[in-house]
Amino acid sequence: MGRFKGENRSQARWIMGGVSKGRGSGKSRKPRQAAFGQTGARVCPSSPQQDAVPRFRWPGDAECASSTHTPTMSGCKLPMGLCPDMCPAAERARRERERRLHRLEVEPGGRGNAPRADPKRTVKEYSRPAAGKPRPPPSLLRPPPVLLATVRYLAGEVAGRGDVSCAEVASFVADRLRAVRLDLSLQGVDDADAATVLEAALATLLAVVARVRPEETRGAADPVLLQTQVQEGFGSLRRCYARGKGPYPRQAAFQGLFLLYNLGSVEALQEVLQLPAALRACPPLQAALAVDAAFREDNHARLFRLLRTLPYLQSCAVQEHIGYARRKALARLSRALSTPKGQTLPLDFIEHFLALDGLQEARDLCQAHGLTLDKDRVVFLRGQYSEEGLPPPGAYHILVGNKLQGHTLEDVVMAEEGDIHRPGSAA
């Protein structure tokens, strides 16, 4: 078998669009955005006219049918919530009586025949509004400060629980955050306060969903439902941005998260490109646009360089697309390098190029696609490459998990991570 010598590594990088200046994948070229910066609470100049309501339909966003600003249409004023707790006392008592408490909500040591609700752990569950049913009284609605404290609790105390599977945590958190959005929509809340709550809720949801491994979703969590909840969170937040005049300090970051979560979507890109130019020029949105451009152009070398530089929350948003991008990159290498006798590349090149977590993950990826291994090299033989099923799940430590860098999820969610060191900038 022919050996793919060291001097030919540059050929592999050229094949993947990583060397020649201005070289893309042969598709239509898009302008490159290279400006990067912090994605925390940075105020970017914004126009009084914010983004339009998304033209594509958000899946199942039923709780927003009676949104915060229906008073402008009906002439009535919505009340403000008065409930001081994360869960109204009446609901706590009812669910305790009906034995419908989640194990994350019971008092320590109270998991026996009659578990007791812990007021400091019980969080209001989502209940779909029924047609013709009167609005809940203010005593059952949590005001914005309580809603924000609830989100902080979910991010700081629940999301990182090690005694419960990530799938169960994600299912619990997604339901409780859905109730947060519903409580918010039933009150006359100022847009700035609403945006603060919705941003924190969406950041928490993105993080807990990203931690769920595919093998954990059987029974404990429905991945489609979790994705729907994330899209509903984006829909609620972007409508809030569209209604208000701002400025919203984190809008650029969350518009960028929207694009990264929907990477490759024409509709999502159109929505972002319709934002005011001043907002699009903010570093977080420039970074997201650069990632989207590299993904569309199949410029895999640039894509994985950019992915390495993204902060933690942005990495959580894009994680779902990483496996697909790795598969496309490996397929392109196979098409370019496969010969009847076979050319080889070092596994450590594949590991670094695709930002994999170690040589074993590189072996697993190559073997899952039918490629032959020769010690620590992968052999590209014509006709061997195959794609069956989904790409193998990765651990994503390099591209996602390691980017908290000693900070907590609560820091990230509450925009208290401004001093987090960035992994670096891409060329």
Swiss-Prot record:
Domain annotation PCI: ranges = 229-397
Any single biological process term in GO: regulation of immune response
Where in the sequence does UniProt note compositional bias of the Pro residues kind? 134-143
Q: Region (Disordered) spans which residues?
A: 1-53, 101-143
Q: Which residues carry the post-translational modification Phosphoserine, per the record? A: S425
State any GO CC term: nucleus
- Superkingdom in the source lineage: Eukaryota
Q: Which UniProt keywords apply?
A: Cell cycle, Cell division, Cytoplasm, Cytoskeleton, Mitosis, Phosphoprotein
Instruction: Please verify whether the record's keywords include Nucleotide-binding.
Output: no
InterPro entries hit by this protein: PCI_dom (IPR000717), SAC3/GANP/THP3 (IPR045107), SAC3/GANP/THP3_conserved (IPR005062)
> Where are the compositionally biased (Basic and acidic residues) regions?
1-10, 117-127
Subcellular location as annotated: Cytoplasm, Cytoskeleton, Microtubule organizing center, Centrosome; Cytoplasm, Cytoskeleton, Spindle
Q: Give tissue specificity per the record.
A: Present in spleen cells (at protein level).
Quote any Pfam family the record assigns: SAC3_GANP
> Does the keyword section mention Cytoplasm?
yes
Q: What family classification does the UniProt entry report for this protein?
A: Belongs to the SAC3 family.
Q: What does this protein do?
A: Involved in centrosome duplication and mitotic progression.
Q: How does it assemble?
A: May be part of a SEM1-containing complex.
Identification of the protein by name:
SAC3 domain-containing protein 1
Q: Which organism is it from?
A: Mus musculus (Mouse)
Lineage, opening ranks: Eukaryota, Metazoa, Chordata, Craniata, Vertebrata
